[in-house]
Each structure stands twice: as C-alpha cells, then as structure tokens.
Amino acid sequence: MAKGFRGGFGGMGGNMGALMQQAQKMQRDIEAAKAEIDALEVDATAGGGVVKILISGTHEIKSLEIDPSAVDPDDVEMLQDMIVAAYNEASRKLAEISAEKMSKATGGAQLPF
C-alpha cells in the first residue's frame, strides 16, 4: 500500500455515510412529495365561471361543469376555447404547487423530474 494512503473517497471517509443518509432522506422526501402531488385536486374556471374544471395531481380531469348559458350551437368554438383555458389554468396551478412541494423536498436543489 502506498505510504499515507488511507483508503476511502478522497479523504471523505466518515462523511460518506452521512452523505448517503442525506441522499436517502431526500429520496424519501421526494417520494412523499410525489405521492402528495398525485393526491392533489386543483380547480380553475373560464368564461367568468361558466366553465369549471377539476383536475387531479396526475393531470386527469376529475370533473367538468358547463353552465347551460355557455352552450351556443352557433359558437361551439367559444365553448371549446373556454374548456381549454380552464384546463390550462388548472394545469398551470398544479405545476406551480408541484414545483413548490418538490423544492421543499429537495432543499431547493433543481433536479429533473
């Protein structure tokens, strides 16, 4: 063995165990945050409230309510636009909440998910 060689990883020695524990805790926190996000329900409206949507944390539509006044057979495109707008708003809200929860779980580290 070379003189002065103590083994380990660049002198990190005892810190490696602590680093592994920290990584495992972060992994558990991330999994808990993902489960919490999946269980979320986020709502949004469009057209002054005539279209209401509720989506899950997995982006599935849970409910869609359309006020009868929004149904105009001569302007189906307007209703389609309101549904898309409501879904996009709910999805944006969900992304914001998800980013906040993941940031807390990772201690602010920007990790790809």
Residue locations for each model-derived region?
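Short, contiguous, helix-prone interaction/anchoring segments in small proteins
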Residues: 22-63
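Long amphipathic alpha-helical segments used for membrane anchoring, targeting, substrate engagement
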Residues: 1-38, 93-113
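Conserved acidic
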Residues: 15, 75-82
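Short beta-strands and strand-coil junctions in structured, solvent-facing domains, enriched
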Residues: 50-52, 72-73, 91
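Stable alpha-helical structural segments in soluble proteins, enriched in small hydrophobic residues
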Residues: 82, 86-97
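Amphipathic, hydrophobic secondary-structure cores in small proteins
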Residues: 65-73, 83
